[in-house]
Amino acid sequence: MMDFGFVDSLKGASKRGKNAVIAEVKVRSPIHGDLLRGRRIEDILRAYEKAGAAAISYITAEQFSGNFETLKKIVGLTDLPVLRKDFIRGRKEVERTAEVEAAALLLIARHLKERTAEMVDFCFEHGIEPLVEVHHAEDLVYAENARAVLINNRDIDRMERDGGSIDVTAKIAEKIRAFKVSGSGIGSVEDLLFVLQYVDAALIGTAFMMAENTEEFVQTVCGGEKMIEDVLRGLDFDKAYELAKTLPELDEIKIAAVLAALEAKGYGAEVIAGFAKGVAEKSKIEIGKVMDTCGTGGDKTSSINVSTAVAIALSTVHPVAKHGNRAVSSKSGSADVLEALGVRIEMDEERARKMIAETNFAFLFAPLYHKSFARVAAVRRNLGIRTIFNVTGPLTNPARPEVQIVGVASEILLVEVAKAMSLLGRRAVVVYGSGMDEVNPNSSTDIAVVNGGVERLKLEPEDFGIERCRVLPCSSSGESAERIRAVFSGKGLKEDRRLIAINFATALFALGYEDLKENVEIFEEKVQSGELARKLEEIACKSTSM
């Protein structure tokens, strides 16, 4: 059998990671009336081509204000294979279609019945791909020699006054062994992703023609990339890894669609680990053995920047490479509060190495070390919602810390992030403090110790030797900086002091200091001696003078 190009063009789109879509040029709809709305067919065609359609369809039937001359014009204007749709009854129409070099022709099995098979063969003889349309499973008996079958989700005998149901595709697709296309009633990306679970390609006309911005909508659907479909079906480690590496290459619309789809679907340890590996792969630096303290955020408590305060305090004991960013969905990110504390946040690898050598502290500003994700970062800011990057941020520190404290905002994330870090071979303590992504001074805190395996523990404020106290809200990075500075100077609020102290104690626990009460005492001694205030001043001065 000859290779006619129509099916192969659709298969090629799938191989390139795109959704295989036939975009229909449709002049009129029995329900919606004029679909051109003053636009030229040439403009519609250019929009389809530019947006990534794999093939073009045109209806020559008079009921849709189509004609044969326009078909000839379309074939001459595009390099994409063109499908002619009409109520074909005889061989003469096949010959006419071949004369204008259309690539494919629709044959409706319900109308042709027993003649369908001979018309399929006649199309092949004339170098045309026959696309046999079926609506009921009973129609399939007439399509046995077809290489490609279109499932029409509407009843063709009722024209378009049957609204159609994409469930038709789901019901009969498995009975078809040929290349499968679903058409009619596909009005959204969600509809497309649904039918693509059952078929190889989709034909869309009315939804494209009625879109406010046809090119943008077609681009989202055609180029919305198979990866969105993969996300909604579910990713494994390898697919999540490839997704993370591919994401920066997409345009903003597709990036937003992928991130939104990930949030809608949800993700577990394998996806978190694979995605984190893909993000971190291009950003590795060598600055020695360090620790990191980082939270995923999202706990809605709006507390001071605890992990940043702990990172500074911890640098009096062990080298710390704090990985962080500006706020995306919260009031104050680690970069924001460090800047408010007078610390230079943009340190390249050389400066970071010097800072570690001279102060035991360096800040690794995420945008500086993940430059390939700059467009992704812009999309995240515009979206204004939490994404998988919030969860994977602590796992993508370019310094590859030997041990980490990671705070998460839910018990589910505690389990999944701990498993993810185990999959990546990391050593860490993951904490969830009853609604906080920190150790909670007023309630229980669940922790997962990751060191080869994962061990679960539960801590109470009394385990640290402190009285329970509430967590005070914070309204800005400036306020957070003032309150951290006050604690380090021994003049801060007791609630802030206890909050930082127990999280510092847990960080020491991750380093092997097992007595939590003693760890709190170490913090208090450092406050009272002025060591923490001096350390903050040293970090700020060194960072700005380099």
UniProtKB/Swiss-Prot annotation:
Anthranilate 2 binds at residue 380. 5-phospho-alpha-D-ribose 1-diphosphate binds at residues 295, 298-299, 303, 305-308, 322-330, 334. It comes from the Archaea. Pathway: Amino-acid biosynthesis; L-tryptophan biosynthesis; L-tryptophan from chorismate: step 2/5; Amino-acid biosynthesis; L-tryptophan biosynthesis; L-tryptophan from chorismate: step 4/5. It catalyses: 1-(2-carboxyphenylamino)-1-deoxy-D-ribulose 5-phosphate + H(+) = (1S,2R)-1-C-(indol-3-yl)glycerol 3-phosphate + CO2 + H2O; N-(5-phospho-beta-D-ribosyl)anthranilate + diphosphate = 5-phospho-alpha-D-ribose 1-diphosphate + anthranilate. Binds 2 magnesium ions per monomer. Keywords: Amino-acid biosynthesis, Aromatic amino acid biosynthesis, Decarboxylase, Glycosyltransferase, Lyase, Magnesium, Metal-binding, Multifunctional enzyme, Transferase, Tryptophan biosynthesis. This is Tryptophan biosynthesis protein TrpCD. It holds the Pfam family Glycos_transf_3. The keyword Kinase does not apply. Anthranilate 1 binds at residues 295, 325.
